[in-house]
Amino acid sequence: MSFDLSRLSLTSSPRLSFLTRTATKKGFVRCSMKSYRLSELSFSQVENLKARPRIDFSSIFTTVNPIIDAVRSKGDTAVKEYTERFDKVQLNKVVEDVSELDIPELDSAVKEAFDVAYDNIYAFHFAQMSTEKSVENMKGVRCKRVSRSIGSVGLYVPGGTAVLPSTALMLAIPAQIAGCKTVVLATPPTKEGSICKEVLYCAKRAGVTHILKAGGAQAIAAMAWGTDSCPKVEKIFGPGNQYVTAAKMILQNSEAMVSIDMPAGPSEVLVIADEHASPVYIAADLLSQAEHGPDSQVVLVVVGDGVNLKAIEEEIAKQCKSLPRGEFASKALSHSFTVFARDMIEAITFSNLYAPEHLIINVKDAEKWEGLIENAGSVFIGPWTPESVGDYASGTNHVLPTYGYARMYSGVSLDSFLKFMTVQSLTEEGLRNLGPYVATMAEIEGLDAHKRAVTLRLKDIEAKQTQTK
């Protein structure tokens, strides 16, 4: 699968302009979403097209490092100070013991939605539990791999421009199934200094043990170093802004001895659509990602010449107009793009190069293309599978690799909360069968102590056999 790179022109492809809302007082203006034909791009141009906007972390690190150092030295006091500075909230208590908190009252429809989501997410992640397998590689040589839960984990649930209780479920449920003993959930407090009731409901349902009422880099630092009230964790999960991401990056390479789930960037979607896809659905799927924030990445891959682009344009303008977060969506679309593919092979080839966080395939007989997909965080197949179902309640996890990292990282799963150990056990016969080969390899590498650890035992086995004769 490859593009026809014989033509290099970028200028002959049509430009698809979407009517989207901007932050100006003029209301709605025409906002262009750049478009390209894949068959007219060179390899280097395709490489440039799939590259995400560069994030300059140098200045962000300059801001975040002092926060991390302050939390390390001052603990809860620093967390309170930064929460007052950034969130305008004075905290009396930084961490709550979830067992001491009552389950909050929720509207019955909201509670039912969370309960259905919980059941589906639990079922999908519970099914990921693997049985222990033992292999006898040669007579008397048995090897196996066993799993153990990570003892303490930190879960970051953003507050920011939107409350995300769904993220509490996505992170806490696999931790609950894995059997993590200490589960700290960090989330910014409300203006009253309390915990968002929807987040608290999900946290209690999914077995969270502590809630850290803080967000940003200070929350990540508190979980990494530990404070008087916040347990130190061994691995930190969850999405966040650039400051949260920077804190995770810094701390995983520090004396804190903490690991993280994956690198993170702005949220993104790539939609592959042909003439059978509804313009209404295409527009809705693009906007559902664009509304996350102005830095969201939105890509539309049009297959063939039968797609009604004008209808998509009209639907985007219509739907964006009624969105409370329409300004975010507008800004995201302004730096996103459309590509035109001659067929599905070309479309999927580009998608695999782009490696999107979310991939929607809305074409005729969409299921038959699943086998060609190599790089994507999560895939949504067919006209009745909007990205929203995976974001909330289908059962798959919505904490996924972004920024092209789907080429080498997986989304959060049950395995993310486990560590694996290998175990081997040899009988006398096993060492007699395997030992000479090990001794030879150790000798080649010049590691005499390794060799001796085997040969001393082999001599004892030989002596024992001689005595019994």
From Swiss-Prot:
Gene Ontology cellular component list: chloroplast stroma; cytosol
UniProt: NAD(+) binding residues: 156, 218, 241
Pathway(s) it belongs to: Amino-acid biosynthesis; L-histidine biosynthesis; L-histidine from 5-phospho-alpha-D-ribose 1-diphosphate: step 9/9
GO molecular function terms attached to this record: histidinol dehydrogenase activity; metal ion binding; NAD binding
InterPro entries per record: Ald_DH/histidinol_DH (IPR016161), Histidinol_DH_CS (IPR001692), Histidinol_DH_monofunct (IPR022695), Hstdl_DH (IPR012131)
Keyword Transmembrane included in the entry's annotation: no
Residues involved in substrate binding: 267, 289, 292, 358, 391, 445, 450
Cofactor: Zn(2+)
Annotated residues for binding of Zn(2+): 289, 292, 391, 450
Transit peptide: 1-31
Gene Ontology biological-process entries: L-histidine biosynthetic process
Reactions catalysed: L-histidinol + 2 NAD(+) + H2O = L-histidine + 2 NADH + 3 H(+)
SUPFAM superfamilies: ALDH-like (SSF53720)
Cofactor annotation remark: Binds 1 zinc ion per subunit.
Pfam families reported in the protein's UniProt record: Histidinol_dh (PF00815)
Active site annotation, chain numbering: 357-358
Miscellaneous: Cabbage may contain multiple HDH isozymes encoded by different genes.
Similarity remark: Belongs to the histidinol dehydrogenase family.
PANTHER family to which the protein is assigned, alphabetical: HISTIDINOL DEHYDROGENASE HDH, HISTIDINOL DEHYDROGENASE, CHLOROPLASTIC
NCBIfam families in the cross-refs: hisD (TIGR00069)
Protein name per its UniProtKB record: Histidinol dehydrogenase, chloroplastic
Naturally occurring in which organism (per UniProt): Brassica oleracea var. capitata
Record gene name: HDH
